[in-house]
């Protein structure tokens, strides 16, 4: 059994995902597995992975179902004690796994924690890094929106199984934010200051969509989704209005 399963959903991003995989094959620690979940790509992703062989990497193709389902599917077949959902267009530094393993031990097998990350342009220019601490991650999620990078969140597998991503296409691009809010009302999200991954800012990012109607509908669905979570609503109380403002 490995300690960490890295689940990488991908859709028509062969040119990106190959670089993402390469960044993981240069890790300081080899106590992990990579699960590539192909969400029904129509480019040459399937053709490429048919002949791709590496002991750390397994390829799984599913019918196109959006990222939430792809992530949940990956978690369901993961062999690790912890799961890391990593986007197929970003990069891991060589300390990503080793740092996660260090803090799993230091924090005594936490339910969830978040490593730090940096934004970078497609040509390698660093833009910004998250500045936070463990006592205010939940507050930041409420007041500042989705400050967490999915790439840097490490979740214990039993927690990932009990609290899956929403699989509705109506929440596509915000399903991770909905989950972080839900989890923050139940567990402490520990913050680790070490930077271990890079979020690449490019035009093809799904969260960069500028379709105003879709954004409005998605935000309305997010609020309805959160209101259906009684535990979360009891936890957040009147602060719920601040989430509405962020939307």
PLM feature spans:
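Short aromatic/hydrophobic "clamp" motif used to bind/position activated sugar donors
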Residues: 83
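A conserved acidic beta->alpha catalytic loop
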Residues: 23, 38-47, 87
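N-proximal low-complexity "stem/linker" segments adjacent to membrane-targeting elements
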Residues: 1-23
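Conserved nucleotide-sugar donor-binding catalytic segment
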Residues: 135-213
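Short, acidic, metal-binding catalytic loop of nucleotide-sugar glycosyltransferases
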Residues: 22-31
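Glycine-rich, basic loop-to-helix element that forms the pyrophosphate-binding segment
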Residues: 62-78
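Acidic donor-binding/catalytic loop of UDP-sugar-dependent glycosyltransferases
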Residues: 44, 90-103
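Flexible acidic/His/Gly-enriched loops in nucleotide-sugar-dependent glycosyltransferase catalytic domains
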Residues: 67, 97-164, 210, 216
């Amino acid at each position: 059994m490995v300690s960490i399963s890295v689940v990488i959903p991908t859709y028509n991003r062969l040119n990106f995902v190959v670089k993402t995989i390469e960044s993981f094959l240069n890790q300081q620690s080899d106590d992990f597995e990579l699960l590539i979940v192909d969400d029904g790509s129509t480019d040459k992703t399937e053709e490429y992975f048919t002949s791709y062989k590496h002991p750390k990497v397994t390829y799984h193709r599913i019918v196109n179902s959006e990222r939430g389902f792809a992530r949940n599917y990956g978690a369901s077949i993961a062999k690790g004690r912890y799961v890391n959902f990593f986007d197929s267009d970003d990069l891991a530094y060589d300390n990503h796994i080793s740092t996660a393993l260090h803090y799993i031990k230091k924090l005594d097998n936490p339910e969830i924690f978040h490593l730090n990350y940096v934004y970078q342009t497609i040509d390698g220019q660093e833009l910004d890094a998250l500045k936070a601490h463990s006592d205010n991650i939940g507050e930041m999620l409420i007041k500042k929106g989705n400050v967490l990078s999915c790439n840097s969140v490490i979740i214990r597998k039993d927690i990932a199984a009990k609290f899956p991503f929403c699989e509705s296409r109506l929440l596509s691009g915000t399903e991770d934010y909905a989950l972080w809010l839900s989890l923050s009302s139940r567990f402490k999200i520990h913050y680790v200051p070490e930077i271990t991954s890079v979020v690449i800012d490019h035009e093809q990012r799904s969260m960069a969509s500028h379709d105003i109607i879709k954004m409005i509908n998605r935000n309305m669905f997010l609020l309805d989704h959160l209101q259906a979570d009684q535990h979360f609503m009891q936890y957040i109380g009147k602060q719920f209005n601040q989430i509405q403002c962020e939307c």
